[in-house]
Amino acid sequence: MADDMVKEQIYTIPLREVRKVPAWKRANRAVIEVRGFLVRHMKTESVQVKLDKSINEHLWEKGCEKPPLSIRVRAVKFADGEVQAELAQ
């Protein structure tokens, strides 16, 4: 699995724009924003971006109305174009 790894990067993803949507949609929108950021910066399609459970738990930690303003993510892109992302330590 390490042989076909192409690119590994740690990103700080800003989620300030999520505060502009209705409160009950914010955590859902944050997941969409994280996926969109990774699609843009890792140059892949959205169906090939896999978010780890830890990212989802961090975004939903304070409920759907109060996601964090930013999140640090470690993203790994493989040779087949798939991107796996997990919460950076």
From Swiss-Prot:
- Drop me one GO molecular function for this one: structural constituent of ribosome
SUPFAM superfamilies in alphabetical order: Ribosomal protein L31e (SSF54575)
The highest taxon in the source lineage is Archaea
Record GO biological process: cytoplasmic translation
Which SMART domains does this UniProt record tie to the protein? Ribosomal_L31e
Q: Which GO terms describe its cellular component?
A: cytosolic large ribosomal subunit
Q: Which UniProt keywords apply?
A: Ribonucleoprotein, Ribosomal protein
The Swiss-Prot or TrEMBL record describes its family as follows: Belongs to the eukaryotic ribosomal protein eL31 family.
Protein name listed in UniProt: Large ribosomal subunit protein eL31
Q: Quick one: which gene encodes this?
A: rpl31e
